[in-house]
Amino acid sequence: MAHSEFSPSQLHRIISCPSSVQLYHDLGVYNEVAPSSLYAEEGTLLHSYMEKALFTSDLSFIPDAEHRTIVKAAAEYVRDFIPKYTQNVKILQEQRVEVPDVPQVYGTADLILYIKDDEVPEACELHVFDYKFGAGVWVDAEDNPQFMAYLLGAVKAVNADTRGKIFAHVVQPRSSCGESKPGC
């Protein structure tokens, strides 16, 4: 899969150091396939489990007990936002999103949930979820350039009514942030 040189996950670096884009070009970074790590492979595996886990409580398809626990916590958090009986819900998993009018800024949102209310547009809700399965670094959704790009792209992807509410969720089941931090 081709990666954007202005991918949402790189925007923090690019905003902090715009010349890094040229440096990465000069070093040929954009032409290389990024090396994988055990952590990246585990994250990819857990993301694939999440795609299935959102729609079932039976997680026996996950062979590892620790992974089952992590995915269960993440799936339960996300499921709390999915309304039970409504026809006006869009759920998009692993959705490519791009910033409107800036097509070189694109990435993949883990989950977009759009709850539309035709009668009361202000009651519409757009939720964008990003799964972070690592244990080391806390990622905040607030003032996060990656999320700003995902949110703009999600509005476009579902043609969201922007008079409603828009939420960013960083789902970090391995964090020890407690209930006071949004996105736990």
PLM region descriptions:
Residues 29-37, 58-61, 135-139, 157-159:
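Short, polar/flexible loop-turn hinges at active-site or ligand-entry regions and domain interfaces
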Residues 4, 12-13, 83, 158-161:
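A general structural signal for short secondary-structure junctions and capping/turn motifs
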Residues 3-55:
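Nuclease catalytic cores
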Residues 88-184:
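Mg2+/Mn2+-dependent nuclease catalytic core
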Residues 32-95, 100, 182:
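A non-catalytic, helix-rich entry segment at domain boundaries
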Residues 1-5, 122-123:
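Extreme N-terminus of proteins, especially the signal/transit-peptide cleavage junction
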Residues 3-5, 71-77, 149-152:
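Short amphipathic alpha-helical surface micro-motifs
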